[in-house]
């Protein structure tokens, strides 16, 4: 393979649909490899736009606009960084010979909880919580009786835990159904109703596929990342690497992740979410891209999840990824709305040995928006976790 020079004829070019913090890290990895980079997002000054060669600001559901930009740029691959995109456009450009990462079908399945649950539980046959689907409060009541109270409902499409509602008894059904749908993406009025389990541990199995020079495909897993969310919080807060669970759990989680990812196909890295509840190891969801909990691999691994995805997009191999040190990551969250925020006490956070701070450069804050992340290495996972908790508590967003 030849890699040309950016902005000249023969350059390799990658285009991202979505320019958040995950996209930013991927663009940086692509820049390190001499790749021309293009980012599309719904708002200007998105994090990945700061480091890309070119940017476009469009409605991410406007299939015509997205398609026209992709046809103009003719990238070597299109990388879906977010799920809130027009999947019909991805299928169309893929049929016209433009590579979509990991593939258009996988993106479509992964952004739709109902399609994904049917795919995982009924086609791939990996263990999940008991579940059902509903389109009205009456149907939710029936499903809740089937799976048992308490149960949890989620919109068919949403991200970062938005719209996840726990129902403890029948009197809450109408209110929780309405609340779930207020966070739904698109026009769907369908929810998934799931058995509520007490989660003891949560893992992300970063699983990736790349083409072999012999013509085959290799599927590999990185030693799992562990993460936790406080009770009632459904978005990412903290992760650490390597996971501190038994080898039996690691084996089952890796087996389920490999099955799901091989059935989805394509190339690149997938973040497969696994829940551990008592002696049950359960598939939860999968992201068809680098995972937010995998930000910790920026310091824990010899090759980050972002570099793995970029390599696969270019058709390059990643034979192995090794965990080189215990590490942890903790988010920096905003409170309230503000334009052009400032960050206080970064210097104090960096006085802690082994700590790094990554500020994403988002132009606007809103309550609980992820604005940065603290990373730390240590002699143990517990030491690294203590460092990131202390450092993240010092940093204020104002």
Curated annotation (Swiss-Prot):
Summarizing the function annotation, the protein's role is: Involved in the de novo purine biosynthesis. Catalyzes the transfer of formate to 5-phospho-ribosyl-glycinamide (GAR), producing 5-phospho-ribosyl-N-formylglycinamide (FGAR). Formate is provided by PurU via hydrolysis of 10-formyl-tetrahydrofolate.
- Identify the residues that the record assigns to the ATP-grasp domain, covering every copy: 118-314
Q: Which pathway is it part of?
A: Purine metabolism; IMP biosynthesis via de novo pathway; N(2)-formyl-N(1)-(5-phospho-D-ribosyl)glycinamide from N(1)-(5-phospho-D-ribosyl)glycinamide (formate route): step 1/1
> Which proteins does it associate with, and in what oligomeric form?
Homodimer.
The reaction(s) annotated as catalysed by this protein in its Swiss-Prot or TrEMBL entry are:
N(1)-(5-phospho-beta-D-ribosyl)glycinamide + formate + ATP = N(2)-formyl-N(1)-(5-phospho-beta-D-ribosyl)glycinamide + ADP + phosphate + H(+)
Q: Does the keyword Metal-binding apply?
A: yes
In this record, what's one Pfam family?
RS_preATP-grasp-like
A Gene Ontology biological process in which this protein takes part is: 'de novo' IMP biosynthetic process
Question: What is the name of the protein in this document?
Answer: Formate-dependent phosphoribosylglycinamide formyltransferase
Protein encoded by which gene: purT
């Amino acid at each position: 393979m030849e890699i040309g020079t950016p902005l000249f004829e023969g350059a390799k070019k990658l285009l991202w649909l979505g320019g958040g913090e995950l996209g930013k890290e991927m663009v940086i990895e692509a820049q390190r490899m001499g790749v021309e980079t293009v980012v599309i997002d719904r708002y200007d000054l998105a994090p990945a736009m700061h480091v890309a060669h070119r940017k476009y600001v469009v409605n991410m559901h406007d299939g015509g606009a997205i398609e026209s930009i992709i046809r103009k740029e003719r990238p070597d691959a299109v990388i879906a960084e977010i799920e809130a995109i027009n999947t019909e456009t991805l299928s169309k450009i893929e049929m016209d010979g433009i590579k979509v990462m990991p593939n258009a079908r996988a993106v479509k399945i992964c952004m739709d909880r109902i399609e994904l649950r049917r795919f995982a539980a009924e086609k791939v046959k990996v263990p999940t919580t008991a579940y059902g689907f509903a389109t009205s409060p009456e149907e939710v009541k029936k499903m809740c009786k089937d799976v048992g109270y308490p149960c949890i409902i989620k919109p068919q499409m949403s991200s970062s835990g938005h719209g996840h509602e726990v129902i403890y008894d029948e009197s809450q059904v109408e209110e929780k159904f309405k609340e779930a749908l207020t966070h739904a993406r698109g026009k769907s009025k369908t929810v998934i109703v799931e058995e509520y389990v007490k989660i003891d541990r949560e893992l992300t199995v970063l699983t990736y596929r790349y083409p072999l020079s012999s013509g085959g495909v290799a599927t590999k897993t990185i030693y799992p990342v562990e993460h936790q969310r406080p009770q009632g919080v459904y978005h990412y807060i903290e992760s650490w690497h390597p996971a501190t669970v038994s080898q039996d759990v690691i084996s089952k989680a890796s087996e389920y992740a490999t099955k799901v990812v091989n059935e989805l196909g394509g190339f690149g890295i997938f973040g497969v979410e696994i829940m551990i509840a008592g002696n049950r190891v359960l598939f939860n969801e999968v992201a068809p891209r680098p995972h937010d909990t995998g930000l910790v691999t920026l310091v824990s691994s010899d090759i980050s999840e972002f570099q793995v995805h970029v390599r696969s997009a270019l058709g390059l191999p990643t034979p192995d990824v090794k965990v080189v040190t215990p590490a942890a990551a903790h988010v920096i969250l905003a409170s309230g709305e503000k334009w052009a925020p400032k960050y206080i006490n970064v210097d104090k956070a960096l006085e802690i040995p082994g700590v790094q701070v990554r500020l994403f450069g988002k132009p606007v804050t809103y309550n609980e928006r992820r604005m940065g992340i603290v990373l730390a290495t240590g002699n143990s996972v517990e030491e690294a976790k203590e460092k990131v908790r202390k450092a993240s508590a010092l940093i204020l967003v104002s």
